[in-house]
Amino acid sequence: MKHHLIGFLLVSSLSLIAQQGPRVNANRLNQNLDALSGYGRNALGQPNRVAFSDGDLEGRAFVIGLMEEAGLKTTVDAAGNIIGRKPGSQDLKPIGIGSHIDMVPHGGNYDGCVGSMAAIEVAQTLHDQGIVTRHPLEVIIFSNEEGGVMGSRALAGALKPEALGVVNSTGYSMGEGIQRLGGDTTRLAEVVRPKGSMAAFVELHIEQGGILDRENQDIGVVEGIVGLRWWDVTVNGMANHAGTTPMDMRQDALLAAARFVKAVNEEALKINGKQVATVGRIRANPGAPNVIPGKVVLSLEIRDLSDATIDTLYENIQKRAETIAADSGTTFEFTPLDTTGKPALTAEWIQAEIRRAAEGLALSHRQMQSGAGHDAQDMALICPVGMIFIPSKGGISHSPDEYSSPEDIANGADVLLSTLLQLDRKLTD
């Protein structure tokens, strides 16, 4: 009886493993992620792998080596994207996975890096186990995500020529940076992927918020990536002597701006939904303690999954500004800046496959939206996309304190692998 029981348990265990499919090598994944974190540190040992920096070049060389070890034919396209390709067994459109490895100044070691290293680990797992997908597999490490999702925008044909002149903290312009990465700004048109040219794209990413961590959930199934718009708001008053100008005779631009900041918060809260509005920067001129500010320039950012909601909130904020201007003897000017991204809904059928993958691995999951922009946002202009989130400890991101546990990272990679294989089986194009 004992032998029969042992045999039954062994068969059951093997059956469960077969149902779950292959799993990534968690130790290798986390070791490679840790190794990547060593590239691009500043003199204080802090993460600082900004796009186009020496550390970025070194990290990219490390990543290219891993991709080649995983059996991927790896090239750098004209926009500086690193693309590793493995042929499929059939003449089908490719399925893409990947993320980015560049970071904000003094950022963290997990934003983008988790998704990039997990995508490479997925390819390595398939290579190790001799699994050939029906669709060609593309692992894409996008260039300069933090500086305006440059690489993914180039693939989508949405990179504006004027963006090439934007200079980042390294001192290189975007155009110079592309050349530095091995790209070619004269051939950017060649990298554009027509709509429908890929079967699907799936990106694994840390949440960069605290919902999954707070609710003790393993996986976030992303419903959509919010769009965001930026404005510079200029408040014009009259600079005057702070000691000789009575309070009732002032045209204080900073006071009007302070009322505006409060109004932005109030208007964002009035609308039912998950929209957010932020004033994150403010500059008062002339900036002297004994002069009433005559001019203030501040930022305005609005994010939501709906363009219509962004429009409505912006209009409401403008109306509040008109009221404040009339009360304070000031004027408000709104200057729209280049948007970081349009709202992008993920494909519901890819969401379903991500949920199925999580459940097959006995991982808890919840639906959620992404409040941050991602490369998948621009890839949605090319093909159906999906996004998988894993918890960020304490909701901290864009900081050296950013952290996701090795277990959560491995869980996310396993969900990515399972989702990829399910899509490969089910997609017919």
Sequence positions of predicted segments:
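N-terminal hydrophobic or amphipathic helices/low-complexity stretches enriched
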Residues: 18-48, 87, 291-292
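Zn-dependent metallopeptidase/amidohydrolase metal-coordination segment
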Residues: 21, 26-32, 42, 95-99, ...
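A non-catalytic alpha/beta surface segment that caps or lines the substrate-entry region
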Residues: 41-87
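A short beta-alpha structural unit
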Residues: 51, 278-287, 299, 331-351, ...
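Catalytic-core environment of secreted peptidases
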Residues: 70, 82-114, 119
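Alpha-helical metal-binding/catalytic segments enriched in His/Glu/Asp
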Residues: 97, 106-146, 229-235, 241-267, ...
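Midchain, well-structured core segments that form catalytic/ion-binding scaffolds
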Residues: 148, 157-307
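His/Asp/Glu-rich mid-to-C-terminal helical/loop segments that flank catalytic regions of hydrolases
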Residues: 223-225, 241, 245-271, 314, ...
